[in-house]
């Protein structure tokens, strides 16, 4: 494999969460019209709908702390699957919420875009 999918996953993850935590309205260029986001139970398609959902989330400040990051090649075409778990600190909360997120990244010229994005909060049973 010529591509280092682990390095790609690390770079993408750092960029995505830094951008999300500072100004999530700017995440639109990572998605395309065919992209899909499943956020908890909501499914949205297209960059515009996805960004509208992310911007509408009911918090002002957010910080993601990554606990695990796993990546695998997802097809012979260079697709990459990325799975992240971590903690989410919202506004002035002191107790983080656990989350999981999966990205399916598709090559697009010299970069990648998010084809699938699945986000889920992990509540203890």
UniProtKB/Swiss-Prot annotation:
Signal peptide: none annotated. Disulfide bonds: none annotated. GO terms for cellular component: cytoplasm; nuclear envelope. Keywords: Cytoplasm, Protein transport, Transport. Residues 8-121 form the NTF2 domain. Coiled coil: none annotated. The keyword rRNA-binding does not apply. GO terms for molecular function: small GTPase binding. It comes from the Eukaryota. It is found in: Cytoplasm. GO terms for biological process: protein import into nucleus. Facilitates protein transport into the nucleus. Could be part of a multicomponent system of cytosolic factors that assemble at the pore complex during nuclear import. This is Nuclear transport factor 2. It comes from Candida glabrata (strain ATCC 2001 / BCRC 20586 / JCM 3761 / NBRC 0622 / NRRL Y-65 / CBS 138) (Yeast). The lineage of its organism: Eukaryota, Fungi, Dikarya, Ascomycota, Saccharomycotina.
């Amino acid at each position: 494999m010529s591509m280092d999918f682990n390095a790609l996953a690390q770079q993408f993850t750092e960029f995505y969460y830094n951008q999300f935590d500072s100004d999530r309205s700017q995440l639109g260029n990572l998605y395309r019209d065919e992209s899909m986001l499943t956020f908890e139970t909501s499914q949205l398609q297209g960059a515009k709908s996805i960004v509208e959902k992310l911007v509408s989330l009911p918090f002002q400040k957010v910080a993601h702390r990554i606990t695990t990051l796993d990546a695998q090649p997802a097809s012979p075409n260079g697709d990459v699957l990325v799975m992240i778990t971590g903690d989410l600190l919202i506004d002035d909360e002191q107790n983080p919420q656990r989350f999981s997120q999966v990205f399916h990244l598709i090559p697009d010229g010299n970069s990648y875009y998010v084809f699938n994005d699945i986000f889920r909060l992990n509540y203890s049973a």
